[in-house]
Amino acid sequence: MKVRVLFFASVADAAGTRSLDVEVEARATVGDLRRKLESERPRLAGKLGKCAAAVNTAVVAATRSLAEGDEVAFLPPVSGGTR
């Protein structure tokens, strides 16, 4: 099945793109997708584990199952601001 993956900020830089369509096995989880992406794109290794994952705009756990057409966003930690 196919899912759409969105990357932001430094993770998009490491991925070399802001979005891509990825083919995953039926009953794949967010964690499975994360491992697949890190395996296929070595520059992502170690980065996606630090990101929150959102499926169809809802933040989810790595154990969340994916469905055909889901949109998965990897959201890197945010820092900065002023005091």
Model regions and ranges:
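Ubiquitin-like/PB1-type beta-grasp interaction modules and other compact soluble beta-rich domains
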Residues: 1-83
